[in-house]
């Protein structure tokens, strides 16, 4: 299996030159553009990895599936989806267009920034510190890694330059789509995006989802089955931003990307996959990481369609 991964990485390294690291968050622009790694966890508890699978990077938008799971567990799916939609979008992940165009002003799905900010507001906790503490502990739980922590430099960079996210949040506050203290909610959001993980962590999160919310290592149920199902479905329809349809056709498995270069994916009842490729395409997805998943999906016949 490791030989296969090594071959797939080398086959797709050429795509790195066509992408760029995220530059709108200054701290992310310091990332090495050439990082490329993959990790896979099977339902039998076997782990394989190749390349830069142990390099730490920030989770960014992959945290949106973490907070979505937690918000549904805390509030129930009916309440969560009364505040945020579940439809795909053709606009960019940080766009304000749909918030203005829709009569309800409700964010169109939980995987775009506006939707994720609303979801963060629904995580239970008496204040922003308690909310984030629960998110961090939940991330550690679903990945089986108690050493996961926040990258404070990225957090500060996000907080200082997150003007678009502030605009989205204050617009939603003005329409009633977002309840609570905007700056406290944004603080939770900036912190959740700054959690530092590796490909190995993502693969373990992926395999938990592939196993319908049960850890293949301990046999313990970590996430209710219906929550895992909802999140996997949203990952298919919305997880790769406005490239989700293309990803579904060519790769065909639930996945969620982040501008840190990571992608978490799962092949239901087979495996979890974590990929890192810091060079991004124009949609904000890892360009080589996507190509690696495409080749892996074809080689192992992973598509659910």
Curated annotation (Swiss-Prot):
Catalytic activity annotation: L-glutamine + H2O = L-glutamate + NH4(+)
TM ranges: none
Any one Pfam family match given in the protein's UniProt record, by short name: Glutaminase
Record: residues binding substrate: 61, 113, 158, 165, 189, 241, 259
EC number(s) recorded for this UniProt protein: 3.5.1.2
Keyword set, alphabetical order: Hydrolase
Gene3D superfamilies: DD-peptidase/beta-lactamase superfamily
Family assignment from sequence similarity: Belongs to the glutaminase family.
Summary of subunit composition and partner proteins: Homotetramer.
Protein name, as recorded: Glutaminase
Organism annotation: Clostridium botulinum (strain 657 / Type Ba4)
Organismal lineage: Bacteria, Bacillati, Bacillota, Clostridia, Eubacteriales
